[in-house]
Amino acid sequence: MFMRVISTGSTKGNCYALQSSTGEIVLLDCGCKYKKILRGIDYQISNVSGVLLSHEHGDHTEAVHEIMNAGITVYTGQETIKNLGITDGTIKAVAEKKYFKIGSFSAVPFSLPHTSANKEPCPNFGYLVEHEEMGKLLYLTDFEHCRYKFKSMELNHLVIGCNYCEELIDRNNPKWKHQITGHCSLSTCKQFIKENLTESLKTITLVHLSGDASDAKKMLKEIKEVVGDDVLVQIGRDGLEVDLKLFPF
């Protein structure tokens, strides 16, 4: 069981593949070129059980129509479907805080605060994903903060958007307010991890770093200081594979 980072970042788009030992794949977002997704899953498109879509923005949805044309089911919120202008096809609305099955995986969506460039609220889901081979993985991206606490659930893996460092924000950039109200800062990321850290946590993958307001070395160092040596902390990069096995065999 592993996760492969197919694409990550504010400009390159975001897509991550969870793959079980049987070859079954679930995609987290599909925000890059369809051909890149195909390469990222070794062209095993028939093994994809579905896509968990967080929100409507292009860096998370670029390939959604091609994914649907391939007969793959996309799961997301009803508002996101409406805002994407999709009226038919292999897309299903899922309800917040309600478990559903996606192949041998299960998932439950929860709302996260996000904004669009026009400063309007943007419906956005994070997902708690479970599989017998990996335990519990939490995926959350493009959020200013998260009001939910997951400590009692004893997460095993965390894939979290760590977009920017406060001191690197360019307030002369007209989009700077969207960046801080629609994305997670390093300090917020650290606080979330502190609040939800247990001995069960095995891996943290930091994703969706800003191209001009992030410092990967600083982020890696400070997150490692929070969790210690028993948790594998990595910066997501295209092609990275993260071992998600719950057991060492």
Residue positions per predicted region:
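Divalent metal-coordination and catalytic microenvironments
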Residues: L18, D29, H55, A107, ...
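Conserved catalytic scaffold of divalent metal-dependent phosphoesterases
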Residues: K98, S104-H114, H131-G135, F143-H145, ...
